[in-house]
UniProtKB/Swiss-Prot annotation:
Record bears the keyword Isomerase: no
Subunit structure: Heterodimer of an alpha and a beta chain.
Any GO BP annotation: regulation of translation
Protein name: Integration host factor subunit alpha
Pfam families in the record: Bac_DNA_binding
Chain intervals for the UniProt region annotation (Disordered): 96-119
Role of this protein: This protein is one of the two subunits of integration host factor, a specific DNA-binding protein that functions in genetic recombination as well as in transcriptional and translational control.
Single GO term (MF): DNA binding
Matches recorded under SMART domains: BHL
Provenance organism: Bradyrhizobium sp. (strain BTAi1 / ATCC BAA-1182)
Gene from which the chain derives: ihfA
NCBIfam families from the UniProt entry: himA, PRK00285.1
């Protein structure tokens, strides 16, 4: 999953888990889906999801405001809503800019680490 300009899909993530962790393809798919569902559920409840050395996903409330139709210029009310925001960590920012940060982003977990029961 390296290179520029490529869009990484769920299938790509599942394949990476399969290749690097050693789970079956079915288990890898279930694992990725479980992680994404947990993140989604937390955001639905208004919780912030903070992944160390990666970034934070959070929901922000936007109030009602007046916008403009770009074609006609007429004012249009925009309803209040919640939006999802991602704030990358300093380490992730450094990595995407080709700098080596002082922290580590460990993406290499063994099958034993992932399947270990929480204490």
């Amino acid at each position: 999953m390296t290179g520029t300009g490529k869009t990484v899909t769920r299938v790509d993530l599942c394949e990476a888990v399969y290749q690097k962790v050693g789970l079956s393809r079915t288990e890898s798919s279930a694992f990725v889906e479980l992680v994404l569902k947990e993140i989604t559920d937390c955001l639905e409840r208004g919780e912030t999801v903070k992944l160390s050395s990666f970034g934070s996903f959070m929901v922000r409330k936007k109030g009602q405001r007046i916008g403009r139709n770009p074609k006609t210029g007429t004012e249009v009310p925009i309803s209040p809503r919640r939006v999802m925001v991602f704030k990358p960590s300093a380490i992730l920012k450094q990595r995407i800019n080709g700098q080596q940060g002082s922290g580590k982003m460990n993406g290499e977990a063994s099958h034993e680490q992932l399947s270990a029961e929480p204490e």
